[in-house]
Amino acid sequence: MTASIYLAIPLMIVLGVVETAVLPHFPVFGTTPQLALLVALAWGLLYGIEEGAVWAFFAGMFTDIFSITPVGISSMAFVVGITAVLWTKQAFPTSRVLMPLALAALATVISFLVNIVLLLLFGIIDNLQSISLLPTAILINVLAILPIYWLLYIIDRIVRPRRVQI
């Protein structure tokens, strides 16, 4: 693992505050994008499963700290969702457009379902009414992943240019 943890922690703190304090005032189709999940997924797409899982852990942790969800539930859901999709990514050809879209949809579904199951198990919710938000959450996250992924990709190429050999 690289020193990216020093970038992950402050970035996830900011994203956690934005997700819980700012974005709820501007819902799109009744929901908001999960920015921390999408940034962790984009980072994992660029740097691999290990980095993605670490970023997902901190994304979930700070999302929980700044919301009313018990600490650790979103973290577990994000780690499971991102690790699962990054593991399956290895079986498909590389694409900088289609793969982020497909993996964002799949990560949203997995993390959403794991989150619902954990909330049911701990008695935080008592019905599955929130599952009705899943289709719009998928749509919003799929629309938001490309700008996030490409921004991180461009920053990565500027900060760490690839060595050219002749």
Protein language model annotation of sequence segments:
Residues 1-166:
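Terminal, non-globular segments
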